[in-house]
């Protein structure tokens, strides 16, 4: 009987220790989570000239559009960013900040520099007293239309079905629907399903394209992955601290890739965009 009591007591003690270790582990996990740099990773369409194969119509010179963009900037500003990154090549950061300085001196005059950069990012920076912006883009050409350059021997049916009706799986998120406000377009773009769709549309769909023994489509898709990895690498070059709050404004497909990378990151914690886009 004494042996039984001893064994039972030992078991209870062991369970208590395990519970304590588990609790400590959870606390450490929460602590590590809170130590990560908060990032608001925001998807947009290009509000100025773009080389994108399909673009949303938007007149950046239109006064109402400029006012609507400013309202978006005010929503985003509630995040309180200390660092702002935009889809401008890192090599053009000096020009970027020259234009930003001009805007700070005359904020009542809308800037259309790189479209959404001038209309949204500059205003977010002004409201939050951010001294300078960072360009993190890396230009890398790839062939969206590789299917037109060869006889597709892989799976032309799947590829063509997607191209003929790309929004078939997410009709409720079609950003080309007429009558949508700017806020609604951006709300749809930042929906997780739409971001997944953008990775499919810009890269993964090309894996269905290729010659009999070739990987032409996959190779083009790899170029787009490469571009986004380099954008991520440019982000990682920035001298950030754990106290920084980072706002990234870029075309939707880049937002989608960066989300994928940062969700696995030991350094960043992506916040919910819809806490600010309301």
Regions found by a protein language model. Name each.
Residues 63-73, 110, 233:
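N-terminal post-signal-peptidase region of extra-cytosolic proteins
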Residues 48-50, 92-96, 142-145, 255-258:
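Short catalytic/ligand-binding loop motif for oxyanion handling, primarily in non-cytosolic enzymes
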Residues 95-238:
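Hydrophobic, often amphipathic alpha-helical segments used for membrane interaction and targeting
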Residues 221-278:
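A cross-kingdom marker for long, charged
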Residues 76, 80-86:
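Proline-aspartate-enriched helix->loop->beta-strand connector
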Residues 1-33:
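Bacterial Sec-dependent N-terminal signal peptides
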Residues 59-61, 69-75, 91-98:
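Post-signal peptide N-terminal segment of secreted/secretory-pathway proteins
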């Amino acid at each position: 009987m004494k042996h039984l009591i001893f064994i039972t007591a030992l078991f209870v003690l062991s369970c208590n220790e395990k519970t304590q270790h588990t609790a400590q582990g959870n606390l450490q996990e929460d602590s590590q989570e809170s130590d990560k740099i908060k990032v608001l990773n925001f998807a947009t369409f290009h509000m100025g000239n773009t080389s994108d194969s399909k673009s949303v119509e938007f007149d950046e010179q239109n006064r109402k559009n400029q006012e609507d963009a400013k309202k978006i900037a005010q929503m985003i500003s509630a995040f309180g960013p200390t660092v702002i990154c935009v889809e401008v090549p890192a090599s053009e950061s000096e020009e970027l900040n020259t234009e930003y300085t001009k805007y700070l001196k005359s904020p009542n005059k809308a800037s259309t520099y790189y479209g959404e950069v001038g209309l949204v990012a500059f205003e977010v920076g002004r409201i939050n007293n951010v001294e300078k912006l960072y360009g993190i883009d890396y230009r890398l050409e790839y062939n969206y239309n590789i299917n037109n350059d060869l006889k597709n021997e892989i799976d032309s049916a799947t590829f063509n079905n997607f191209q003929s009706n790309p929004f078939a799986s997410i009709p409720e998120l079609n950003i080309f629907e007429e009558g949508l406000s700017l806020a609604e377009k951006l709300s749809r773009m930042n929906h997780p399903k739409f971001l997944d769709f953008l990775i499919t549309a810009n890269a993964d769909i090309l894996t269905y394209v290729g010659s009999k023994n070739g990987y032409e489509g996959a190779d083009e898709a790899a170029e787009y992955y490469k571009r986004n990895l380099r954008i991520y690498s440019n982000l990682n070059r920035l001298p950030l601290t754990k106290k920084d709050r980072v706002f990234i404004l870029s075309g939707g497909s880049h937002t989608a890739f960066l989300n994928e990378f940062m969700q696995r990151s030991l350094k960043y914690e992506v916040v919910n965009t819809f806490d600010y886009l309301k």
